[in-house]
């Protein structure tokens, strides 16, 4: 069972919602720059590029440790980074759902929102 957070932007006409899975993100850990580009988080892209440039100029002894630190930090904090980005763009936390999959979380959310 996973925890999913549902975010809604009430200022949009179509009222689309975004489902975020809490926990470690392998995609964000392994493809940090591409993950940030996909979600249009330009500040995160700039910080990631600068951090990778710093990692390449560090002494060889610490280079591996710094790269592992970057990978793990992106993996663990990807959901938090995305939540912060959504909050800054007028999205609000609508619901928290425990489900087996993203589709099940979406169905549970739609069932709850219809009953309200």
Curated annotation (Swiss-Prot):
It comes from the Bacteria. The keyword Membrane applies. The chain crosses the membrane at residues 58-78. GO terms for cellular component: membrane. It is a single-pass membrane protein. It is found in: Membrane. Its main location: membrane. Keywords: Membrane, Transmembrane, Transmembrane helix. This is Uncharacterized protein RP318. The lineage of its organism: Bacteria, Pseudomonadati, Pseudomonadota, Alphaproteobacteria, Rickettsiales.
């Amino acid at each position: 069972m996973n925890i999913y957070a549902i975010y809604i932007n009430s200022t949009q006409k179509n009222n689309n919602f975004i489902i975020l899975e809490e926990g470690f993100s392998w995609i964000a850990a392994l493809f940090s720059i591409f993950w940030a580009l996909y979600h249009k988080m330009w500040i995160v892209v700039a910080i990631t590029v600068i951090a990778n440039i710093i990692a390449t100029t560090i002494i060889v002894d610490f280079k591996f440790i710094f790269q592992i630190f970057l990978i793990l930090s992106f993996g663990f904090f990807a959901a938090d980074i995305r939540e912060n980005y959504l909050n800054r763009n007028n999205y609000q936390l609508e619901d928290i759902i425990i489900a087996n999959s993203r589709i099940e979380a979406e169905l549970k959310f739609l069932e709850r929102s219809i009953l309200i």
